[in-house]
Amino acid sequence: SELYALVQKDIKKNKFIKKIKIKKSFYDEIIKNNKFDLIINSETQNKISKKIFFKRITKDYKSVAFTTIVKHQKCINNKAVQIFTSCGPLAFLPYSNTETSIVFSVLDEKKNKSEKEIKELIIKYNKYYKINSFKNFEKYNLKFSILRKYYHKNILCFGDNLHNIHPLAGQGFNMTLRDIKILSDLIDEKIDLGLPLDSSILKEFESKTKHLNYIFSSGINFIHEFFKFDNKYGNNYSKEILKYLGKNNLFNKYISKFADQGLAL
């Protein structure tokens, strides 16, 4: 993807990041030795994750997601939009003034939809952009996963390896951004005080984020289950509820802040 290419480019320029070739014994050495002060593990399928971080709360949404990026005419593109369709939630997530990321979650994985059908549905519900073209579609099964324990000794799980939620309005990425901010602040604080970067940072990180991430992800799960239930009955409940809430200024102000910043308890 373009984002991956940009990250790779920045990493190559960064003198503090060293690229290494992973050998078979690499993960065993990390687990056994104390060569590094802190290790951040964001890969879900490596030996560290499988051997140490395997206790998770999981849920199969029994849904599939289609993702793509659309190119469109230039516009002020600074608002994420979530539409609850009869097939499932459709999210328009700003990427730039000429590109928007699309995430379409089909509620029933048994109802196979072709790329052509998904494209037609996106065009049908799009009221915001003059679309010029679609990039390649990606399709994946949706599953919820959140770790019970965030760290082991000096190893911290991070990103999708830490929590993977339903892509309602792109909130999974927002959760990771908030985690990055909290972890970065904790590291800066230790450095400013001249204290070592050790596992105490990971303990503090878990203490500051675990309850918020769980509450937040549970809220996303509730919204998903509600609209899945509501979808079976012709969206009668959601139409009335959203119609009422749409007129409530206080609710709209809070929900916008919640979407941008998440929980702040």
Language-model segments: which ranges?
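Short beta-strand to alpha-helix junction loop
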Residues: 1-9, 109-116, 142, 230
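Acidic-histidine catalytic/liganding microenvironments
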Residues: 14-15, 152, 248
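Active-site catalytic microenvironments for nucleophilic, acid-base chemistry
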Residues: 10-13, 72, 186-190
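A general structural signal for well-ordered alpha-helical segments in protein cores
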Residues: 3-4, 8, 63, 119, ...
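Conserved FAD-binding catalytic core of PHBH/FMO-like flavoproteins
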Residues: 42-129, 134-137
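C-terminal helical "tail/cap" subdomain of flavin- and related membrane-associated enzymes
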Residues: 185-265
